[in-house]
Amino acid sequence: MRLISWNVNGLRAVMNKGFNDFFESIDADIFCIQETKLQEGQIEYKPDGYFVYWNSAVKKGYSGTAVFSKIEPKNVTYGINIEEHDHEGRVITLEFEKFYLVNCYTPNSQRELTRLEYRMKWENDFREYLKELNTKKPVILCGDLNVAQNEIDLKNPTSNRHNAGFTDEERGQMTNLLNAGFVDSFRYLYPDKAGIYSWWSYMFHARENNAGWRIDYFITSASIKEKIQDSKIHTEVFGSDHCPVELDIEL
């Protein structure tokens, strides 16, 4: 089974930059996107053979997630059932026979870390949500999780030491998640692979210089880690400041 996750930084914009070509060529069983920046009805995109689910933010042109699945889920939920977290369209959960698929766009802590305190509350509540799912059946979490966990996961760790996405607090929360029974699929397969990133700033020719961060993930329940076949980062795909990531797994 092939799963794709991509922060598209605005679905309408990326539609003009080869999104559909990649979507069709990769032929994913499940394709998740983050940062759609759409309200309901603003775009009609329903590829043949896919069930489509959208979760939009109340605020226009902001956040938002979507899932395209060849397999019809048993159930779909939007958000994590906590009101303060559920107005930004950040989470969609699809329940399948053998697993849960959770598509997430984690809140950014922002410059000057103005949202770090909220981010910590989000992390604690979201982790509890995932742990509860994991008691029922295995979980596959994907999305832009807005954190590079270790120094190997970004080009310039020293200069970014206290910046959003690489604070001790955010990194610690990723450690807490993994310690709660989950596995970072990419690092599980490639513990020492360096220089592979999924996001680059639009400034300072960052992508050209590969001055990036690995902040887009497929994280699975530890109970199914042996079923992971590959975890890929499609650095060759443009159209957004992020590139797609892929999980191949036999479930």
Predicted regions and their residues:
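N-terminal, active-site-proximal structural segment of metallo-dependent hydrolase catalytic domains
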Residues: 1-47, 51, 57, 62-63, ...
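Active-site beta-strand termini and strand-to-loop segments that position acidic
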Residues: 70, 94-97, 221-222, 247-251
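Conserved beta strand-loop-helix elements of the APE1-like EEP
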Residues: 60-76, 196, 203-226
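Surface-exposed cleft-lining segments at the edges of enzyme active sites
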Residues: 81-82, 107-123, 158-162
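Active-site beta-strand/loop signature of hydrolases that rely on acidic residues for catalysis
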Residues: 7, 23-41, 101, 130-151, ...
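Active-site-proximal beta-strand elements of phosphoester/diester hydrolases
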Residues: 1-9, 98-110, 142
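Metal-dependent phosphoesterases centered on the DNase I-like endonuclease/exonuclease/phosphatase
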Residues: 30, 51, 122-211, 215
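Structured beta-strand-rich core segments of catalytic domains in phosphoester-bond hydrolases
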Residues: 37, 42-109
